[in-house]
Amino acid sequence: MSDVELDHEYWMRHALTLAKRAWDEREVPVGAVLVHNHRVIGEGWNRPIGRHDPTAHAEIMALRQGGLVLQNYRLLDTTLYVTLEPCVMCAGAMVHSRIGRVVFGARDAKTGAAGSLIDVLHHPGMNHRVEIIEGVLRDECATLLSDFFRMRRQEIKALKKADRAEGAGPAV
């Protein structure tokens, strides 16, 4: 494995740690780390439910911090590591902020905007192209998400079962 690949894995592991914070807050476990010159300048994890903010995705949180650190809305020569393929909103923010590269773990067939559903980052109508590297720690990223949604389905099933048992009343 090359030094560059090891570097990508290092930062993706950091993003996975942040994704676990989202899980702990009962948010969809996605984490993001924005790196400039081998230094973290922004990080985030999904928080739209807790913050009552539909834009509080991990990527947006990391980009906002990066802008404050660099004191610039242009995040030139930065790399954003994120555990899940970005959505249209996040991909659009990446284009507007002029990041150099996004590295993501798991693809998102339903809402992925880096090639799965649509490719905002390479769209010919955009005035900036973002380099895409995908599949870094893919299995770990995908497993975290599938485990989270499995747990949520089991919780919902248990609640429905409890509601049915509660509503049944005594046998006559």
Swiss-Prot record:
Catalysed transformations (reactions): adenosine(34) in tRNA + H2O + H(+) = inosine(34) in tRNA + NH4(+)
Keywords noted in UniProt: Hydrolase, Metal-binding, tRNA processing, Zinc
Positions of the CMP/dCMP-type deaminase domain: 6-117
Domain of life the protein comes from: Bacteria
Top enzyme class: hydrolase
GO biological process, one term: tRNA wobble adenosine to inosine editing
Residues of the active site: 59
Binding-site residues for Zn(2+), renumbered to this chain: 57, 87, 90
SUPFAM superfamilies the UniProt entry points to: Cytidine deaminase-like
E.C. designation(s): 3.5.4.33
Cofactor annotation remark: Binds 1 zinc ion per subunit.
Cofactor(s) this protein cannot do without: Zn(2+)
GO MF term set: tRNA-specific adenosine-34 deaminase activity; zinc ion binding
Pfam families per the UniProt record, alphabetical: MafB19-deam (PF14437)
Subunit structure of this chain's protein: Homodimer.
Matches recorded under PANTHER family: CYTOSINE DEAMINASE FAMILY MEMBER (PTHR11079), TRNA-SPECIFIC ADENOSINE DEAMINASE (PTHR11079:SF202)
Annotated NCBIfam families: PRK10860.1
Free-text function comment from the UniProt entry: Catalyzes the deamination of adenosine to inosine at the wobble position 34 of tRNA(Arg2).
Family: Belongs to the cytidine and deoxycytidylate deaminase family.
Protein name per the record: tRNA-specific adenosine deaminase
Native source organism of the sequence: Salmonella typhimurium (strain LT2 / SGSC1412 / ATCC 700720)
The encoding gene: tadA
